[in-house]
Amino acid sequence: MPRKGPAPKRQLMTDPVYGSPLVTALINKVLRDGKRSLAQSIVYNALEGAREKTGQDPLVILKRAIDNVKPTLEVRSRRVGGATYQVPVEVRASRSTTLALRWLVQYARLRREKTMTERLMNELVDASNGLGAAVKRREDTHKMAESNKAFAHYRW
């Protein structure tokens, strides 16, 4: 650990269209090879498509999707006397949001629709309705933490 203490948290800029740091974080997750304008068009078109598909405000859809995918528990490996245990630990709020965005984009990329815009739009709509692969990933993570509850006394 550095002597100066932990590095200060940087505030994300708000995006120009919605004025939300969550949308900026989503754009940063979609970003590949420094092509920010492409990532922005993918995210904005996906949010507009979600508005047309559901008739709801895109920011509400995004927020609900993130809330449905955020994990509250995860397992971390801990080595104790030659054995490695999967120890369940609580997830900090900032990490849970980061994981939710990561899983949404990861599972959107694995979908079978033709364009990334369609994939992201459908994954966001599914996640906001409590469906989709990203929500399943959260449930699997919670199930893993629940099944390893016996090792909770090893947490640090």
From Swiss-Prot:
The keyword rRNA-binding applies. Gene3D superfamilies: Ribosomal protein S7 domain. CDD domains: uS7_Bacteria. The keyword DNA repair does not apply. GO terms for molecular function: rRNA binding; structural constituent of ribosome; tRNA binding. Keywords: Ribonucleoprotein, Ribosomal protein, RNA-binding, rRNA-binding, tRNA-binding. GO terms for cellular component: small ribosomal subunit. One of its GO terms (biological process) is translation. One of the primary rRNA binding proteins, it binds directly to 16S rRNA where it nucleates assembly of the head domain of the 30S subunit. Is located at the subunit interface close to the decoding center, probably blocks exit of the E-site tRNA. This is Small ribosomal subunit protein uS7. The gene is rpsG.
